């Protein structure tokens, strides 16, 4: 028995009470509203003497009762995006100024992937690191609830597919880089003994070289848990299998190499489109057995947002007691001058909202851009038994990532669900994908006329027969119609939009395109759709397809 299993046993004991609490749905239904008001009050109290806190009278707000606190806060602080915080952040990061948005000096800034805009620098305070640590413990607490033995899990290795841990440090001692670079150095003994790929490989910023080094470091290891985006797990799985076979091992699947792999923790992108390929790598069949357990997260550079608390459920429970306060802006109102925002107990199931956060690192009513829907909502403040469960939400897109060139009103979730359904119906093993509009054009001497439409570009492991591709296209189109009445209308009776176009590229095309953009790595996501053709044309050009 490995001595690190004792760490798992100790962690299991330490988390026993929290594990029970994670499973108490009635507790989270009853108390989420109060917990969230408490987080807001604590945030305002801590930041009351900062420049931002003084100018927005946080000290006065902290003296209000729970019923008036939120209304007062909303009156004092407007919802805003990064540009509104940029001057403050520049002073804190470049000038080393203290007590600006949050008490003291912020010594770490997470550089975001910039999926909807240019790079942003998100403050990461000591309190935020503690918040993230607490949420990380909740991952293990929920894993126990899902049937994982921490004793058994921590007997082997835990593999993290994160970004580079290399940081740029300025003259004020302030470090900027991937969030991985801020968190990984905090891994201490004894967890450091089971952590893969190790700090030397974690420092690497050349992602193809990093995947190669990671595969070589873990091909002979007893990997029992993997944390990362599924798209990069697949790249690693493929290389690990190649190395194992080259070394003479009769490995047909990842299960042959890592038979004790028990838990995949994933987040950042929707898992369903990658499910069949993960199963194929694990068991040899796209409809075969899966890794024993999967657990989905909703992490962000701004703070941890939600964790899956029910096996197999798409709804993720809001981290309502982690020193962050969440509000939700109706998607159709997000561009208003003063958009309305609702606390977790004020939302309605099935409506789309843009996430707005107030964090323990000094972002106040900050619009992060993700679009979510709630499957369950908690009791309203002071109104028992009015909710349907803990605050559980699903990520359905980005408020700047949509397709509405012809009134079709498609969002990321529609595209992801349609790709997953079509892949499942045809048995295709897909990689990355994206979609964009096809603009109509009149016939010319050089080209025929073209109707308005939609193009989806996707990766596949090999050749696809015309019949199979036509079947994929038909299911993809049908699934979009099922989800979206506007798309159905535009596709009915020749009212404007032609059937979708599917362009198939070889595996690796998207990562080559991302590398050309300087966006390759475990912290960067391929955009799933856009209301322009930049992504579609860019990845096709990178693959040499006109």
Language-model regions: role of each:
Residues 62-75, 156-163, 497-503:
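Amphipathic alpha-helical surface "interface" segments used
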Residues 110-116:
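Conserved helicase ATPase motor motifs in RecA-like P-loop NTPase domains
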Residues 143-190, 201-204:
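Conserved AMP-binding loop of ANL adenylate-forming enzymes
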Residues 1-58, 94-95, 184-546:
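Active-site glycine/GP-rich loop and adjacent strand/helix microenvironment
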Residues 135-143, 304, 312:
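Short, basic alpha-helical nucleic acid-contact segments in DNA-binding proteins
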Residues 34, 38-42, 46-109, 121-127, ...:
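Active-site diphosphate/adenylate-binding microenvironment
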């Amino acid at each position: 028995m490995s001595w690190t299993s004792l760490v798992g046993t100790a962690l299991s004991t330490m988390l026993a009470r929290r594990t029970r609490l994670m499973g108490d749905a009635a507790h989270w239904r009853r108390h989420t509203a109060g917990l969230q008001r408490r987080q807001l009050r604590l945030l305002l109290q801590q930041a009351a003497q900062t420049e931002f806190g003084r100018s927005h009278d946080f000290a006065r707000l902290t003296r209000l009762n729970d019923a008036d606190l939120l209304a007062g806060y909303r009156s004092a602080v407007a919802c805003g995006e990064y540009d509104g915080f940029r001057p403050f952040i520049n002073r804190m990061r470049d000038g080393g100024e203290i007590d600006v948005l949050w008490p003291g000096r912020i010594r770490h800034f997470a550089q975001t992937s910039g999926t909807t805009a240019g790079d942003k620098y998100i403050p990461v305070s000591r309190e935020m690191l503690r918040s993230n640590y607490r949420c990380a413990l909740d991952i293990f607490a929920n894993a126990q609830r899902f049937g994982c033995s921490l004793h058994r899990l921590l007997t082997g290795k835990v593999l993290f597919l994160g970004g580079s841990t290399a940081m740029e440090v300025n003259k004020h001692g302030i470090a900027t880089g991937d969030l991985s670079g801020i968190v990984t150095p905090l891994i201490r003994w004894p967890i450091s003994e089971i952590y893969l790929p190790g700090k030397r490989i974690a420092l690497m910023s050349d992602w193809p070289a990093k995947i190669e080094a990671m595969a070589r470091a873990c091909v002979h290891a007893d990997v029992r848990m993997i944390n990362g985006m599924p798209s990069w797990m697949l790249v690693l799985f493929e290389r690990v299998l190649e190395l194992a076979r080259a070394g003479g091992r009769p490995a047909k699947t990842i299960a042959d190499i890592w038979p004790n792999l028990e838990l995949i923790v994933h987040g950042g992108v929707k898992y369903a489109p990658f499910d069949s390929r993960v199963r194929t790598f694990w068991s040899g069949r796209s409809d075969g057995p899966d890794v024993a357990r999967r657990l989905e997260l909703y992490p962000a550079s701004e703070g941890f947002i939600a964790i899956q608390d029910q096996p197999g459920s798409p709804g993720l429970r809001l981290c309502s007691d982690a020193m962050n306060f969440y509000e939700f802006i109706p998607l159709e109102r997000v561009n208003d001058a003063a958009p309305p925002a609702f606390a977790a107990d004020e939302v309605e199931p099935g409506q789309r909202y843009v996430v707005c956060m107030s964090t323990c690192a000094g972002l106040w009513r900050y619009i992060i851009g993700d679009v979510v829907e709630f499957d369950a909502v908690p009791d309203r403040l002071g109104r028992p038994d009015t909710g349907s469960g803990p605050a559980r939400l699903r990520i359905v897109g980005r408020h700047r990532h949509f397709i509405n060139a012809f009134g079709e009103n498609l969002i990321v979730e529609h595209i992801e669900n349609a790709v997953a359904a079509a892949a499942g119906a045809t048995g295709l093993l897909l990689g990355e994908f994206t979609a964009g509009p096809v603009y109509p054009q009149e016939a010319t001497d050089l080209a025929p006329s073209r109707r308005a439409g939609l193009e989806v570009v996707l990766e596949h492991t090999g050749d696809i027969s015309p019949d199979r591709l036509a079947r994929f296209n038909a299911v993809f189109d049908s699934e979009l119609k099922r989800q979206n009445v506007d798309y159905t209308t535009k596709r009915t009776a020749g009212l404007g939009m032609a059937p979708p176009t599917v362009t198939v590229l070889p595996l690796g095309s998207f990562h080559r395109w991302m590398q050309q953009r300087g966006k390759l790595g475990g912290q960067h996501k391929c955009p799933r759709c856009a209301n322009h053709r930049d992504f579609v044309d860019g990845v096709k050009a990178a693959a040499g397809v006109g």
